[in-house]
Amino acid sequence: MDPKGQRVKLNDGHFIPVLGFGTFAPREVPKSEALEVTKFAIEAGFRHIDSAHLYQNEEQVGQAIRSKIADGTVKREDIFYTSKLWSTSLRPELVRPALEKSLNNLQLDYVDLYIIHFPVALKPGETLFPTDENGKPIFDSVDLCRTWEALEKCKDAGLTKSIGVSNFNHKQLEKILNKPGLKYKPVCNQVECHPYFNQSKLLDFCKSHDIVLVAYGALGSQRLKEWVNPNLPFLLEDPVLSAIAKKHRQTPALVALRYQIQRGVVVLAKSYNKKRIKENIQVFDFELTPEDMKAIDGLNSNMRYNELLLGVGHPEYPFVEEY
């Protein structure tokens, strides 16, 4: 942690802000909103912005970042921007063109972090979710170690400062860590993580290898029908979280975010609501007690909101492992 406790050091020497702004929004949300809310998030104090080629909003998010640099709110080096390599570009020869496409959409010279979004390779092409005539995903077969080597080259070329992964299980991480001739370790593994699914085993594994765990879905997910089982309970209505929030005069969302930061997890707060964006930055204004942390640990039931079922049946589908 740096003095203000708001950034952690990655294993390659760069620093990542512990609180990030997630820019993903459902399809029906107009893309122009990504521009507005990202500008607002930067004004509110967010310095870590998380997006991806899959979100189809990098043009707007890049525009927001550039406008806040142009008006003097921030310098480029104040912003930590993450993009992600989508599953249709996991073949090694497609990695750099995919990153260059993101940079072109963003109109930025580099990203701070480039990560493999999901270890399941899909058929290359413009279609994000290629399917056959029966609506089944069309998989591709790619050695993730070769994909990783292509990411290492992107780092060497200065297109990204750091490289990492997302939605990997510990065996997939091990495969990269044990790869002969490994040049750079993944700096992070971005996974679903919240009090109902606290990823304690994966977190311990990552910490033991100096890999930062980044939490998405930290507030329990946006519950999009195509991704999330609608019968699952709402995290933010949990009585234990509510009681702890009341005690600290905070919201359950802030308690859920604070919980991650105190465990050494980098946490993404995803909201397109300006009041809540402003509220989420207040996560640094209070501290949970060891008793609070223990009570929240007790909520874990290994309940995954985002099963990413499109990858089921692929040999690299990550969620068949316990962690």
Curated annotation (Swiss-Prot):
NADP(+) binds at residues 20-24, 50, 166-167, 190, 216-221, 270-280. Its main location: cytoplasm. InterPro entries: AKR, AKR1C, Aldo/ket_reductase_CS, NADP_OxRdtase_dom, NADP_OxRdtase_dom_sf. One of its GO terms (biological process) is doxorubicin metabolic process. PROSITE patterns: ALDOKETO_REDUCTASE_1, ALDOKETO_REDUCTASE_2, ALDOKETO_REDUCTASE_3. Belongs to the aldo/keto reductase family. The lineage of its organism: Eukaryota, Metazoa, Chordata, Craniata, Vertebrata. One of its GO terms (cellular component) is cytosol. It comes from the Eukaryota. It holds the Pfam family Aldo_ket_red. Its EC number is 1.-.-.-. It is found in: Cytoplasm. Coiled coil: none annotated. This is Dihydrodiol dehydrogenase 3. SUPFAM superfamilies: NAD(P)-linked oxidoreductase (SSF51430). It is an enzyme of class 1 (oxidoreductase). Keywords: Cytoplasm, NADP, Oxidoreductase. Disulfide bonds: none annotated. GO terms for molecular function: aldose reductase (NADPH) activity; androsterone dehydrogenase [NAD(P)+] activity; bile acid binding; ketosteroid monooxygenase activity. The active site is at Y55.
